[in-house]
């Protein structure tokens, strides 16, 4: 089994550098505990890269990523760069090109409510008692966001805006197999999201998903219209295990599912290419208002590193250990400000203290 890995580390803007520092501590501990090695190359991205190199994704950063087994990404953006043209701002100028260059067609967004944090959710306790763990599998490079033609035509009050929604058999089959593989390793339940009652692309989507399901007889497949799925996520989220979504539907539902957990600071994500390459990042933003104050929640960045261990390095045992260490810290009452409720048994801790606690749990496990 491979024991050495090359990682491109892109801390970015806002809280990115400080939460990334905690993820680096955790990877140090993984090296020690599991006898592996991570060669880490740090590179600029986002606003930090604009300030230094003139663009959000410098060529040097791309080269470092191309020479790596995976990318661990922090966060980008902030009001400092909001006056730039939209395509030059940190978010669009860095993330979209990275997805295109590396063929990142699949987005995995876990939405996890840990048993110790059910009170932080916006849902009633009886709806989420014991917590839940949902994985949203979103197709990332097709659908209405990318298909052509699109644009605005005409003048004055007669203008017309238009977009095209399109999927091919191959695009749907590729993402469907990722979702079935994930479901097979989890609760063996897959819900495919579409709008097949009105959209031709969804008719194709459903037909392909049904065809692929024959290769996964151990996974229970069901279909759900996207409007019903949005309602069911709020009404009874524990019914779901893996959700398979086209691009736009996954964009919306993954954010909805994420907010049910109480804080974006808890949630990781992975964007995967074919093979083992992927980019891993927190689901939240750069939070420039709290940057540098040592109060940001590093858990999403740490869990993103755990996803990197699982999907790009094949180190499932290490990933499990990191995730369990995080769960143990939360069960012990440790809370950063975003999830602190001043309840009995809770202890307010800093960014660095939370990282140190996860490392301590990991080492002793």
UniProtKB/Swiss-Prot annotation:
GO terms for molecular function: 3-isopropylmalate dehydrogenase activity; magnesium ion binding; NAD binding. Gene3D superfamilies: Isopropylmalate Dehydrogenase (3.40.718.10). Mg(2+) binds at residues 227, 251, 255. One of its GO terms (cellular component) is cytosol. Pathway: Amino-acid biosynthesis; L-leucine biosynthesis; L-leucine from 3-methyl-2-oxobutanoate: step 3/4. It is found in: Cytoplasm. The record marks 145, 195 as: Important for catalysis. Substrate binds at residues 99, 109, 138, 227. Its EC number is 1.1.1.85. Keywords: Amino-acid biosynthesis, Branched-chain amino acid biosynthesis, Cytoplasm, Leucine biosynthesis, Magnesium, Manganese, Metal-binding, NAD, Oxidoreductase. Catalyzes the oxidation of 3-carboxy-2-hydroxy-4-methylpentanoate (3-isopropylmalate) to 3-carboxy-4-methyl-2-oxopentanoate. The product decarboxylates to 4-methyl-2 oxopentanoate. This is 3-isopropylmalate dehydrogenase. It comes from Syntrophotalea carbinolica (strain DSM 2380 / NBRC 103641 / GraBd1).
């Amino acid at each position: 089994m491979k024991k050495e890995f090359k990682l491109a580390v892109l801390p970015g803007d806002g809280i990115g550098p400080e939460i990334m520092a905690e993820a680096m501590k955790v990877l140090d501990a993984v090296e020690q505990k599991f006898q592996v090695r991570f060669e880490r190359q740090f590179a600029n991205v986002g606003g930090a890269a604009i300030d230094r190199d003139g663009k959000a994704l410098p060529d040097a950063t791309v080269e470092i990523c191309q020479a790596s087994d995976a990318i661990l990404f922090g966060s980008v953006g902030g009001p400092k760069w909001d006056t730039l043209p939209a395509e030059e701002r940190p978010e669009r100028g860095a993330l979209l090109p990275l997805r295109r260059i590396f063929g990142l067609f699949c987005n995995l967004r876990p939405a996890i409510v840990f048993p110790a944090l059910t009170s932080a959710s916006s849902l009633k306790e009886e709806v989420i008692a014991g917590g839940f763990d949902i994985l949203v599998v979103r197709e990332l490079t097709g659908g209405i966001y990318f298909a052509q033609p699109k644009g605005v035509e005409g003048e004055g009050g007669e203008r017309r805006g238009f977009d095209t929604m399109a999927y091919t058999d191959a695009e749907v089959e590729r993402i469907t197999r990722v979702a079935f593989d994930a479901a097979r390793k989890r609760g063996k339940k897959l819900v495919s999201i579409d709008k097949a009652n009105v959209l031709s692309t969804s008719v194709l989507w459903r037909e392909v998903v049904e065809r692929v399901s024959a290769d996964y007889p151990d996974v229970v497949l069901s279909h759900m219209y996207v409007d019903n799925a949005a309602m069911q996520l709020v009404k009874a989220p524990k019914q779901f295990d893996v959700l398979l979504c086209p691009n736009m539907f996954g964009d919306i539902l993954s954010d909805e599912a994420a907010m049910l957990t109480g804080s974006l600071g808890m949630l990781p994500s992975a964007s995967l290419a074919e093979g083992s390459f992927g980019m891993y990042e927190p689901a939240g933003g750069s939070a420039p208002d709290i940057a540098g104050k040592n109060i940001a929640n590093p858990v999403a960045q740490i869990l993103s590193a755990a996803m990197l261990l699982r999907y790009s390095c094949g180190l499932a045992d290490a990933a499990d250990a990191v995730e369990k260490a995080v769960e143990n810290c939360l069960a012990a009452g440790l809370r950063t400000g975003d999830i602190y409720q001043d309840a009995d048994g809770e202890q307010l801790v800093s960014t660095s203290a939370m990282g140190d606690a996860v490392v301590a749990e990991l080492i002793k496990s």
